[in-house]
Amino acid sequence: MNYRIIISTLLLVTGLFARTWVETTTAQPSEPIWTSNSISDRHIEINFDLGGYFVTELPNGKKQISFPGGVPNLEEGAPDLPKMAQSIIIPDLAHMELSILEADFIDFPLDNIISSKGNLTRNIDPASIPYTFGKAYETDKFYPPNIVFMRDPYIMRTVRGQAIVFQPIQYNPVQRTLRVYTHIKIDVQENGLSQINPLLRRPANSGSNEFENIYSEHFLNYSRTSRYETLSEQGPMLVICYGDFMETMQPFVDYKNYKGLPTEMVDVAEIGGSDEIEAFVETKYYEDGIAFILLVGDIDQIPSPRYSEGAGSNSPSDPSYGFMAGDDYYPEIMVGRFSAENTTHVVTMVNRTINYEMNPDPTADWYKKGSGFASDQGPGDDGEMDFEHLDNIRDDLLGYTYTVVDQVYDPSG
């Protein structure tokens, strides 16, 4: 590893939530750069380069560290530092092993790094939770201890993936030193077999244009992987419909088949409750390769699985119908719902959908209008208040094709 120590004082702009970009290799704020070299489908090298980071000074005198694209670690009572993950495609049965080949860092003297309040659920007001400072603040060690680690493998329809998490910023509270890794190079290769989420079975007609597009954006090594080349096609779609709405939904089904998306509609009464629906969907997935499910009816008419974890325990979960393979939460099927209570609602949804797809009007003004809704809470992503985050999104939209983006923000929104 290469080491550099820089003794410097960070001069922050005064004011509420003042934020300063600290350059390591890049003058302007930018997301880290990922590059990869696929030596084979069982062996890949990855480079991670960080050009700088933000220091946000909070009203309580504490400082928050972030960088573009990073997310907080959410370990309660530990220094609130950012991390970033990227997924790679891995062999169906392999155990992958990671080693660090290169790591360059810079040390900055810095104190008063804020702690994390942990992973708060939506029913908890962050302002009601006090900051705590745990064991990491009393230990003469850099936190987090690992700058790179791998999560468990997962399955996404026809491919098996694994997320690699980079934690390029560490903090030693005793030495009051912030360590920033500007460059990390790792090697990931197969080493034996894994018992965690092996990919043992694929659906029939597994090619799907929509999922191929997801793979290309989601996996760092997708474009360099030839093992999973398939003849891609659209769909198919399964419509599970409340019986009283079947006739009203038929034009939608006919249209989808007409445009080349094989679509089948089934009365939910012929299937049963959520357990029976899950079993029915699994059969359709492996036998027909369905890529879409559309539920038609409200929750009392088309039930969904319920789980008892976190806030909103026992709440219905439509997306759970799409989890077919493995014990992860990556979908094999995309799930949607026409949440209709009566046929009038269904007619509206069917007509709007068909008209939108058949008669697009790219010159219409509404295509170029948007609205942003934000609370007065924060800081969150990139150390930004909610309204600041929405303003950044608004700037991006206005710089693209949008002409109007409303700002509906607390407390006046």
Write out the residue ranges for each language-model feature.
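Hydrophobic or amphipathic alpha-helical targeting/insertion segments
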Residues: 280-320
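Generic domain-boundary/flexible-linker signal
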Residues: 175, 304, 381-383
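Sec-dependent N-terminal signal peptides
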Residues: 3-14
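A domain-level signal for caspase-like cysteine endopeptidase catalytic cores
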Residues: 237-265, 331-413
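Metal-dependent DNA phosphodiester-chemistry modules and their immediately adjacent helices/loops
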Residues: 309-343
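Extracellular pro-sequences of secreted precursors
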Residues: 18-295
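Short secondary-structure capping/junction motifs at helix and strand boundaries
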Residues: 4, 288-292, 364
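Short, conserved secondary-structure transition motifs
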Residues: 272, 297-303, 377, 412-413
